[in-house]
């Protein structure tokens, strides 16, 4: 399982946002019980999402967010990617730091 999450919870969360422009980060994290994950698990999850190991999640990495949970999941639309980035980008630098990602999950 990804970051210690329950596979059935993750499958339900992915199914709920299968349609384009239906992704809502709060609903996804709630369905997957990600908010119950420890801060260490959240940092590990963010580090796994950080494909280029920059310490940040850039828009191209956020776009592929769902595929980290299931290879067959769709990419996020540009609108979904921008909405998730803006929701978590506390310092306005256009990227999510790993700490910002952990805060976003807990919202």
Swiss-Prot record:
GO CC terms, sorted: sarcoplasm
InterPro entries xref list: EF-hand-dom_pair, EF_Hand_1_Ca_BS, EF_hand_dom, Parvalbumin
Presence of keyword Hydrolase: no
Keyword entries, A-Z: Acetylation, Allergen, Calcium, Metal-binding, Muscle protein, Repeat
Functional note: In muscle, parvalbumin is thought to be involved in relaxation after contraction. It binds two calcium ions.
N-acetylserine: residues bearing it: 1
Residues annotated as binding Ca(2+) 1: 50, 52, 54, 56, 58, 61
Protein's name according to its UniProt entry: Parvalbumin beta 2
Record domain EF-hand: where: 37-72, 89-107
Coiled coil: none
One Pfam assignment: EF-hand_7
Molecular function (Gene Ontology), one example: calcium ion binding
Similarity comment text for this entry: Belongs to the parvalbumin family.
Binding annotation for Ca(2+) 2: 89, 91, 93, 95, 100
């Amino acid at each position: 399982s990804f970051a210690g999450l329950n596979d059935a919870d993750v499958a339900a969360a992915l199914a709920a946002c299968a349609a384009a422009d239906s992704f809502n980060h709060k609903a996804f994290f709630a369905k997957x019980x990600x908010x119950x994950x420890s801060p260490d698990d959240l940092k590990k999850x963010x580090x796994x999402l950080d494909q280029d190991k920059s310490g940040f999640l850039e828009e191209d990495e956020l776009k592929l967010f769902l595929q980290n949970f299931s290879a067959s999941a769709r990419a996020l639309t540009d609108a979904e990617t921008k909405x998730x980035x803006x929701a978590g980008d506390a310092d306005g630098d256009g990227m999510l730091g790993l700490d910002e990602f952990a805060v976003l999950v807990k919202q």
